[in-house]
């Protein structure tokens, strides 16, 4: 066979790398249901079916360096429709985890590094966090029926610990009120923690399993410190 610039050398294929991923990508029958269900299909030529086939062929460098895995929203619609039960979101996450950290696009890696260093993706100091949540609590207390409302911080022995999405203390503070009003109306014994309160684990989206373990472990440490048995993770 004559080689062209598009010919793929067998030496470039790494079947072992992707065969080890628990995604059963080699079961693909190329039916295209994943592509028809994908909300991101067609963006920059993205096609989940092609992504699965690339993994099946062992196109390691091509798939790791491609933009496609980062276009995926990981919503899971493709997996839901796949007749072969191929776990495409798991495959995408595994592929993302193979990319060098300094080449991860957008703010994902920077936010993750901030979270590992400070306990939240914003790098928000403890004092600023407390000021923001107490200010939101003060606004709630101005509403009829919530005059006695206060946000419980580091309440030992509470029934429920609620984590917080970083955007709720940044650009969407109004959304905090909905949760807290429900707690108040239900007479729930709840609290938030002043440290490691971050409820968003960006390692989930970058494929960084070690970072996910660290973030989850910190939440567990807070639960042990405050002697709390129940966790609400709104994210």
Residue ranges and their predicted role:
Residues 25, 42, 55-233:
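Iron-sulfur-cluster electron-transfer modules
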Residues 1-71:
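Ferredoxin-type iron-sulfur electron-transfer modules and their immediate structural context
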């Amino acid at each position: 066979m004559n080689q062209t610039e598009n010919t793929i050398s067998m030496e470039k294929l790494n079947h072992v790398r992707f065969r080890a991923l628990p995604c059963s990508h080699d079961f693909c029958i190329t039916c295209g249901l994943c592509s028809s269900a994908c909300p991101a299909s067609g963006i920059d030529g993205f096609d989940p079916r092609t992504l699965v086939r690339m993994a099946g062929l062992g196109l390691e460098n091509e798939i790791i360096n491609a933009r496609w895995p980062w276009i995926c929203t990981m919503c899971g619609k493709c997996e839901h429709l796949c007749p072969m039960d191929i776990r495409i979101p798991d495959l995408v996450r595994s592929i993302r985890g193979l990319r060098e950290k300094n080449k991860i696009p957008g703010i994902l890696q920077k936010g993750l590094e901030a979270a590992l260093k400070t306990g939240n993706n914003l790098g928000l100091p403890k004092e600023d966090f407390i000021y923001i949540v107490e200010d939101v609590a003060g606004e709630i207390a101005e509403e009829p029926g919530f005059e006695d409302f206060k946000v419980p911080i580091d309440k030992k022995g509470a029934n429920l610990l609620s984590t917080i999405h970083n955007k709720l203390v940044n650009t969407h503070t109004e959304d905090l009120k909905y949760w807290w009003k429900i707690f108040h109306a239900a007479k729930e014994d709840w609290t938030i923690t002043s440290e490691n309160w971050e409820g968003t684990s960006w390692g989930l989206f970058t494929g960084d399993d070690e970072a996910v373990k660290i973030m989850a472990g910190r939440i567990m440490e807070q639960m042990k410190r405050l002697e709390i048995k129940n966790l609400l993770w709104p994210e």
